[in-house]
A protein has these predicted regions:
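Hydrophobic, aromatic-enriched alpha-helical segments typical of multi-pass transmembrane helices
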Residues: 1-210
Length: 210
């Protein structure tokens, strides 16, 4: 198996792992399709009602970020070998920072949120420590999202310079990432799944062309 196909595997698996993690809390007998958008108290009650699944969901989503880092590290090696070292390395630094932030955020949701959820069920009120920590967690998420979109745009520019894939892939990655970044800056929120779409496309094309 050549390096293109090897690189494709973690990029595709990252999307699969994230999709599993994002789907777990919203399906099944105790699933809640609105669990990610509920008010604080209702969110904690929903988590408490499905705590084990919530933990596994965040494990899968944390693993997805690590797989993404592995895949993009391998892609960076290919891009450097093709002579493009600036944008690919900037992209990798950005992804590394974003993944660290996301893993911390996922751990926060898997541990602190579950603990607060159990206390909410026991006392009937949201623990006073939780909302400040939730705001801190969202700040982590926001920085993660901004950095990740910028990193993906850098990879799009790098792809354009080396011709590893058709030019539309590079342009599509840049345009999609910048558009989602602008939407984030306007609305203040985004779906983390958006960070996995360009790498999924890149992974599929590398697999097909490998």
């Amino acid at each position: 198996m050549n390096e293109h196909r090897l690189t494709a595997i973690p990029l595709i698996l990252a999307f699969v792992s994230f999709a599993i993690g994002a789907t777990l809390p919203v399906v099944g007998e105790k699933g809640n399709i609105r669990i990610f958008t509920l008010s604080v108290r209702e969110h904690l009650l929903a988590v408490a009602d499905n705590a084990a699944v919530w933990r596994w969901a965040n494990i899968f989503m944390g693993a997805a970020a690590v797989l993404l880092l592995v895949g993009l590290t391998m892609l960076t090696t290919i891009l450097e070998g093709a002579g493009e070292r600036v944008l690919s390395r900037l992209g990798l630094v950005g992804v590394l920072l974003a993944v660290v932030l996301w893993v911390v955020f996922s751990a926060h949701r898997a541990v602190i949120t579950v603990m607060a959820a159990q206390e909410t069920v026991g006392t009937g009120t949201v623990p006073p420590y939780y909302e400040p920590l939730a705001q801190w967690g969202f700040a982590l998420f926001y920085v993660y999202a901004v950095v990740a979109f910028l990193a993906l745009a850098a990879y799009g520019g790098s792809l354009l310079q080396v011709g590893l894939l058709p030019a539309w892939v590079g342009w599509g990655t840049i345009i999609f990432s910048i558009a989602m970044l602008v939407l984030l800056l306007i609305t203040g929120d985004t779906l983390p799944a958006f960070h996995y779409f360009p790498p999924l496309l890149i992974g599929i094309l590398l697999l097909l062309r490998g």
